[in-house]
């Protein structure tokens, strides 16, 4: 493959799967001798992006306002000035702005790639994500979603490339890891105890299933299990009212002394190591189940609702943890079973991150001729 210049577009570089994938592909491009450009409003992951050797150009292309159209000429000039070969849009508004910019470039226009990271509600606005010359779907669930809701999409343009995990970043931990548990309990005393530690990572939104996790904990403790629950990420800025609801529910259930509702942690490998059972209880089907891969890499069992990309990933990696959505009795039974007889983790975890990077660069190669 000749050296390419690839620009990735996304709203910002704060946190999340879209941002993480952007950094991972920037790293792969630079490693392979290509030029990696990223356009966004910036954010706390900017230093990590620049550490990959990628170049960042600051434009607020995620602001949902007609004012954002003023960035179209700037993007067009950028694509021409940098002799961009491929424009890769990772969310809807940046994709629309890129489409408008490319329309004015004629035969000199770069190839257009999109990645569908989520299961957005079908609409004309969302349809832009299915309009790339190549459309990367992060799971078979996403591919089916695209073909069902945008039937004019040519299936030959779709490429399924699951998100990946670097096993070196999520090293296998002993079962059970007393040192990791002690470190977590020192920071969050409610998590101290000899019973199971349940972990539900995720943002402070109702869709992440925090209520289901609290109810599961209450039922397990009623069964005589000294279980504890840690929900890192639920205490989001601006989500004080939601956190207050969760705290009220915990008190009502009589489990407030066994729950830690905290801000996100940057030490997720250590969080997995400290836990005995990882929960993925999103109320709405999600595009992919990266948490499943991360937890299995560390050697922890996962319990989740069997729908969307999470169900797809669980069935592939640990089918014992896939439970009929919203069946609280089945969830409780599966939790006890996974703790009593945790499934053996893979002897070695494949480098699914490198596989994702290689597959994405192969898509770029398809369009570079």
Predicted features along the sequence, with ranges:
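Short hydrophobic beta-strand element within catalytic cores of glycosyltransferases
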Residues: 38, 301-304
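A conserved, positively charged/aromatic
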Residues: 103-140, 151-152
């Amino acid at each position: 493959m000749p050296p390419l210049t690839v620009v990735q577009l996304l709203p910002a570089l704060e946190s999340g799967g879209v941002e993480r994938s952007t950094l991972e592909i920037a790293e792969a491009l630079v490693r392979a001798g290509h030029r990696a450009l990223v356009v966004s409003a910036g954010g706390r992951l900017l230093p990590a992006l620049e550490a990959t050797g990628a170049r960042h150009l600051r434009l607020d292309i995620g602001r949902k306002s007609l004012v954002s159209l003023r960035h179209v000429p700037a993007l067009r000039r950028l694509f021409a000035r940098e002799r961009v070969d491929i424009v890769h849009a990772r969310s809807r508004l940046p994709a629309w702005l890129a489409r408008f910019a490319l329309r004015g470039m004629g035969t000199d226009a770069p190839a257009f790639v999109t990645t569908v990271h989520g299961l957005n509600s079908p609409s004309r606005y969302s349809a832009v994500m299915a309009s790339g010359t190549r459309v990367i779907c992060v799971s078979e669930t996403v591919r089916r979603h695209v073909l069902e809701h945008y039937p004019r999409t040519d299936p030959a343009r779709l490429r399924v490339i699951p998100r990946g995990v670097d096993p070196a970043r999520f090293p296998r931990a002993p079962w059970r890891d007393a040192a990791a548990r002690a470190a977590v309990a020192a920071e969050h005393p409610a998590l101290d105890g000899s019973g199971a530690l349940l972990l539900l990572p995720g943002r402070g939104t109702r869709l992440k299933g925090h209520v289901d996790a609290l109810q599961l904990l209450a039922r397990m403790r009623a069964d005589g299990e000294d279980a504890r629950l840690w929900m890192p990420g639920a205490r989001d800025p601006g989500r004080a009212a939601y956190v207050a609801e969760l705290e009220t529910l915990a008190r009502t259930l009589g489990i407030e002394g066994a729950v830690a509702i905290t801000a996100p942690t940057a030490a997720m490998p250590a969080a997995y190591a400290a836990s005995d059972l990882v929960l993925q209880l999103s109320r709405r089907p999600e595009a992919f189940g990266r948490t499943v891969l991360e937890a299995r890499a560390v050697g922890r069992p996962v319990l989740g609702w069997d729908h969307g990309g999470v169900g797809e990933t669980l069935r592939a990696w640990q089918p014992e943890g896939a439970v009929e959505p919203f069946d609280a009795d089945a969830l409780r039974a599966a939790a006890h079973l996974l703790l009593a007889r945790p499934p053996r983790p893979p002897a070695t975890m494949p480098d699914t991150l490198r596989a994702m990077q290689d597959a994405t660069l192969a898509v770029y190669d398809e369009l570079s001729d």
